[in-house]
């Protein structure tokens, strides 16, 4: 159910699922030497058929576990994992992603530092001045995808069959003179 978001620099990176770093048949040519020289991080991986697989993330600036729902590839199975989800990056480089298991959206900055999170469990009757149930302020049952602009965040809530429009505010603002 949970996956990770990985941030690679413009020079690229790789996620290796094969301990021998075999290049898949779909890739043409060998990985460049500068990529292979980058540091790696070993992580647990779920490849659809095994929860005990190992993976190596090479050349990443950071990775964040907690992106959900994450679509699994069920190799050799007739199980349908039909949901895919989406995260977004705003004009300032902040990453907005759904955390379906916690009924919220989480936000990290360009260095993977948590900035904020918003949303709580709620159904179609929840939230808003005209709602039958006034709380929570930002109700979510199945936050599936997120889109962010410089002023608003849009969240597709599959179970509640709606798109939430959340206005971004700042707790404090300060101006200074530029010399």
Walk through the language-model features, giving the residues of each.
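Eukaryotic scaffold repeat domains enriched in small/polar residues
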Residues: 1-179
């Amino acid at each position: 159910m949970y996956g990770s978001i990985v941030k690679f620099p413009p020079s690229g990176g790789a996620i290796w699922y094969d301990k021998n770093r075999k290049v898949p048949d779909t890739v043409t040519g060998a990985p460049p030497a500068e990529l292979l020289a980058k540091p790696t991080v070993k992580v647990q991986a779920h490849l659809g058929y095994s929860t005990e697989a190992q993976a190596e993330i090479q050349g990443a600036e950071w990775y964040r576990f907690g992106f959900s729902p994450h679509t699994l590839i069920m190799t050799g199975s007739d199980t349908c994992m039909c949901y895919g989800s989406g995260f977004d990056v705003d004009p300032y480089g902040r990453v907005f992603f759904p955390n379906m298991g916690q009924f919220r959206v989480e936000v990290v900055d360009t260095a993977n530092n948590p900035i904020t999170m918003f949303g709580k469990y709620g159904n179609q009757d929840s939230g808003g001045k005209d709602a039958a149930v006034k709380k929570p302020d930002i109700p979510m049952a199945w936050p599936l995808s997120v889109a962010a602009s410089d002023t608003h965040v849009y969240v597709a809530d599959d179970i509640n069959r709606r798109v939430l429009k959340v206005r971004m505010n700042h707790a404090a603002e300060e101006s200074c003179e530029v010399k």
